[in-house]
Curated annotation (Swiss-Prot):
Classification via PROSITE patterns: RIBOSOMAL_S5, S5_DSRBD
Family, per entry: Belongs to the universal ribosomal protein uS5 family.
GO CC terms: small ribosomal subunit
Organism annotation: Mycolicibacterium gilvum (strain PYR-GCK)
Disulfide bonds: none
Gene3D superfamilies in alphabetical order: 3.30.160.20, 3.30.230.10
Protein name: Small ribosomal subunit protein uS5
Region (Disordered): 1-41
Purpose: With S4 and S12 plays an important role in translational accuracy. Located at the back of the 30S subunit body where it stabilizes the conformation of the head with respect to the body.
GO biological process, one term: translation
Length: 222
């Protein structure tokens, strides 16, 4: 009887130890891997432009799968495009997001708009971008708008001059953004002062944006 009571108390102590330590419950308290993934995803803007169902003819019939065109950006000048394919829609979107993050590139912006007029081409898609004054907004179509918003462009005039296929429009928009150059780069290449290269309004808008960023940083540290 004493041995049985001792064994029972030992089991109770071991069980209590697990309860005190939290055991598997600690993963739930920390949020698990899902919590970390949610926090990481919240730092980026994700836009699913289009989802298509495709099929492959095999000996036994047809095999269906889904493709997803995804735009990912931080809203501060970084953006990327990804194309995912899987048997299920969520898996295709996840693959597209992963590829888009691998394709990140920096977009030069001044005061929330593009630095100069530019035209990008990809396959049959042609997209033209023009700078716009503050308050104009993003004047663009659906596929082009998704890229510009994820890149952090707030004021721009965009026009699609070629194919209206979403994939072509997205890649043409990316090609246009990759052609953008900062005024310092153009001035250095031409050997001219920056005032002779960039319009006065653009330089003034950049100074105002930098002043706002500095004031916001000071308020955040205060």
């Amino acid at each position: 009887m004493a041995e049985q009571a001792g064994a029972g108390s030992a089991q109770d102590n071991r069980g209590g130890g697990r309860d005190d330590r939290g055991g598997r419950g600690r993963r739930d308290d920390r949020g698990g891997r899902g919590g970390r993934d949610d926090r990481e995803k919240s730092n980026y803007l994700e836009r699913v432009v289009t989802i298509n169902r495709v099929s492959k003819v095999v000996k036994g019939g047809r095999r269906f799968s889904f493709t997803a065109l995804v735009i990912v950006g931080d809203g501060k000048g970084m953006v990327g495009v990804g194309y995912g394919k899987a048997k299920e829609v969520p898996a295709a979107i996840a693959k597209g997001v992963e590829e888009a993050r691998k394709n990140f590139f920096r977009v030069p912006l001044i005061g929330g708009t593009v630095t100069h007029p530019v035209q990008g081409e990809a396959a049959a898609g042609v997209v033209m971008l023009r700078p716009a004054s503050p308050g104009t907004g993003v004047i663009a179509g659906g596929a082009c708008r998704a890229v510009l918003e994820c890149a952090g462009v707030h004021d721009v005039l965009a026009k699609s001059l070629g194919s209206d296929n979403a994939i072509n429009v997205v890649h043409a928009t990316v090609a246009a953004l990759k052609l953008l150059q900062r005024p310092e780069e153009v001035a250095a290449r031409r050997g001219l002062p920056i005032e002779d290269v960039a319009p006065a309004g653009m330089l003034r808008a950049r100074r105002e944006a930098e002043a706002l960023a500095v004031s916001a940083a000071r308020e955040g540290t205060a």
